[in-house]
Amino acid sequence: MEEERENTNSIYIVSELLEEIFLGLPLKSILKFKTVSKQWRSILESNLFVERRRTLQKNHPKILAAYNCDYCTRPGILPKSQFEGDEEIVYLHTDATQPSMTCDGLVCITEPGWFNVLNVSTGQLRRFLPGPDPGPQANWLLGFGRDKVTGKYKIVRMCFHDCYEFGILDIESGEWSKLMSPPHIMRVGSKSVCVNGSIYWLQISVSYIILALDLHQETFNGVYHLPATWVTQDTQLVNLEDRLAMAMTTKVGPEWILEIWSMDIEEKGWSKRYTWSKAYSISLAHRVVVSWPWQKRWFTPVSVSKQGNLVFYDNHKRLFKYYSGTDEIRCLSSNINVISSYVENLAPLPLKPSHTHHDLGNSNSKFSTSRCHLFPTRGSWISKVFRRNVLFTSLVVVGYIYLPL
């Protein structure tokens, strides 16, 4: 009996040491080690390890962008690094015009008759039907996020036109269930964002309101107190440093100003109190904003560095970085389709009998690595050199700086 207890303790210590070693390994090595043994796979797919790894990777956020061309029609992952300071961009080979939602490194892409959920880090893909009686897709209001209590990822689909249908899909079980009706009718097309276990939608009509859905309790709340003096149709709702944030570009005299406000939640019993504080007020040089009255322009924050520098992009495919210490704006890219910030996530997407299968060429469960002309073809001498020396293909970009006027 004593010998069994010692053996048990020994195995526990070994597993604990393995976990610490795995935490510091690059993603490619971790994915390979999953195939070594059942014990290693169990450690690497455990909720504890996945959460610890995700927390560590939050200190190294990347940017997820869409890349599309006529050469490759099948979706694929294009790992490509573009460094400006500590900024790294990972490319997903997909149609940039397709609606997409992201949460913690997972991407939900909608297409006619399907929801596609992809883990960019592991390459796992799951496809789901839109549920019973979904109504026309053009009438859907969608959301995608993570239940912070159970860790489960969920898709929300609401229809306010022709039929009133409100459903929520559990990615793990693959089953749809009904949601209670929200307290407000929302405008179709409102973009959603998930922050700390809740999905938020911004409604801009006669009045301003943010609709919030708690993914664990599956209940709705309304956020009514907004900085209403500057909320417009171009206001962007984002997750910035695990806080809900609003971004709006306004013109003050001859100057354009990018203002970003962050929301804090104070919970007292069953009630919640929402307050807003201004995080950034950035003067945009005239070369950043073209003052043409017929041209709409808005900016969306992506991430904030440890130094307080802000990465953001506009609706004309330009990516910028604002350096708070020197009050300068640098253009990182002039032609990029930013999807969102991206954090490595090893959360497995289980494939169960309840999931709907649909053939994607050779596999229903994997996105391929794309063979686009932008990168060396597999087997070429360039490809061999690249694979031997670096994990990601590096692209040097010459940036240019916008100094304040």
From Swiss-Prot:
Q: Which residues form the F-box domain?
A: 7-53
Keyword annotations for this protein? Kelch repeat, Repeat
A Pfam family recorded for this sequence? F-box
Record bears the keyword Ribosomal protein:
no
Q: Which domain of life is it from?
A: Eukaryota
UniProt repeat feature Kelch, residue ranges:
146-197, 356-400
Q: Which InterPro entries match?
A: F-box-assoc_dom_typ1, F-box-assoc_interact_dom, F-box-like_dom_sf, F-box_dom
- Has UniProt tagged this entry with the keyword Zinc? no
Q: Which NCBIfam families match?
A: F_box_assoc_1
Protein name stated in the entry: F-box/kelch-repeat protein At2g43445
Species in which this protein is naturally found: Arabidopsis thaliana (Mouse-ear cress)
